[in-house]
Amino acid sequence: TITVIVNFSFLENTMSSTRVIEKISKPEGKLFKLKPMNNEQNIGFNYSYLFFNHNINPKIDDGFIYILPYKKEAQMFVEELSYLGSTYSNKEEPKGWKSYSFTSEEVQKIFPVRKGIVIDVVRDYNVDTTKLFTYYNKMNSVKIEHNDGTIALYSGFNKDEIYVRVGDVVYPKYNTLGNTEVYDARKKHRINFSLFYYSTKNDIKLSSLSKNNQTEIIYITPTFYQNGESIKLKKDFFYES
């Protein structure tokens, strides 16, 4: 989803607002329409526009229950990841920071946690299994946007075994995103997962947005369905899907 803001510096023969905000998810089509006050005269206008490659300030479904991202009856070990920006570059931890690492002794098929549209795929990296890594950020990944504007990031795929493309609609337990790969000399399989959305900073209204540094990422701690219950994942536990 792209957020588009159109600013009119001059309008003639129309009652349109001088600032129009639209959120679009299709590659082409009509953005909006100006209607004349007098059908016998032309509409006059001058405009400029901004666009942001995100759905900013979406209406989040706080009660949504997510599905664990691996096949039924499989078990994976859950760890919580620290925010590396604070450790290595003095960046402030994002609001709500939460990122999980699901690990396994064997390759796992990874599925989406809810229905969504694939918006980004990275399949550029090979793994070095001769070393041990404290952290590893060069990971093949899939990013999926959901219909409430949240975005899920899955990282840790075998670059030759990612099965989706940008624009694909994917469903939990039905569409395999890809297969995990070992990430260092410990020979464990890992998939990292986080859920987030984009928001304006400091309660700035969307209608007042003028540049990218006025937005921020806010992370969500998802609720998952597991064994007939709705749960928050605890670190250092095995969970069966």
Language model regions located:
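Surface-exposed, glycine-biased beta-strand/turn segments
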Residues: 20-138, 226-241
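Surface-exposed loop/edge segments in extracytoplasmic proteins
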Residues: 13-19, 151
